[in-house]
Amino acid sequence: MAQNDTPVKALVLAGGGARGSYQVGVWRALTELGWRPQIITGTSVGSLNGAMFALDLYETARDMWMSIRSQDVMELPEENADLSELHAFLREVVRDGGMDVTPLEEIVERVLDEDALRASPIRFGLVTVEKRGLKPRELTLEDIPAGKVKDYLLASAACFPALRAKQIDGVQFLDGGYRDNMPTALAQKMGAEELVCVDLEGVGITLPNRTGLPTTMIRSYWELGDILHFDPDTARRNMELGYYDTRRAMGYLRGCAYAVSTSAESCEDAAAFAWKFQQVQKAVREKYPVTLTADAALLLANMKDAQLAPLEAAAEDAGVDPTVFYTTRTLAEAFLEKCDRERIESFAPLFEGSGNAAQAARAALLPNTFLQALVCRALTKRRDRKSVV
């Protein structure tokens, strides 16, 4: 334990290339909530982000992610390159063992100060892999020779074979994700007693967490984009997702796919919606077996908040924006605005008791659309319990 009897906290940042923007949103939320780590460990892009976080460079990290594009990280062919030029580029990539990451090296050189990182009160560690024999190297700042921190950060992020291996003092190093994409064990070795882990579901090997330490896992329900496609719009979206997912993981939001308020009014509305949804299901199930198809759609969506699960699954299918803060009521309103009313109204006879076998069969063939219809009915049909919208 730390001197004030609070556990030593560690932030563990996984690798995942361009998805790393998500971790900036996580950092913003943790800072707002007053959760400060004494230790940060990272692999690949997680090590680059972790170094900036250890230096308290949130604005720098945010602005960097909001501005960089793929060509700012690696040498790419011109957008208007013809086929012969593309072939020449690919031959060069194969010959040189991956794409040139000089642009990334320039970014790291510009934003990271080794002396300041060594002076930070936050202890820092990273994982990289020796290319020969794929030997993992867990390194704390104390293990890294003076003047070599930026080299080892780039080594940790050398996503071979897409990117070139990083050579340091005659030894070639690869992305740490080849052996340990989520360095929880390193955090424990450095003295951690409580972990917050941020998973980007990147390529590589994520070892089981065998530390036995209290662990909060932060992971997006949503796809975060391609690992080698750096784009400001995607970064902006990922940061918002990371922010809300962290607040949810820490108990300040509810929902699974959407950031939903835990206020008393919102929770009352969620309970009211769940009751109305069950009543609609029950009424239809008494006449047709088609509600089973909606249940299947819910299982596929894998929503963990039982009261909100149907609304969240329907909202996702309708294309409701997940980067916005909602109450139950505003999420319901957003769904009703986005859903295709004309399409789901075709199921109305099933709710009114005048449906036929063909309509029931159509519901069975379109479980997601039928789930939307059930949710829409629950939200708009007036009953003897509090209305959600």
Question: Whereabouts are the PLM-identified features?
Answer:
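Patatin-like phospholipase
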Residues: 1-43, 51-389
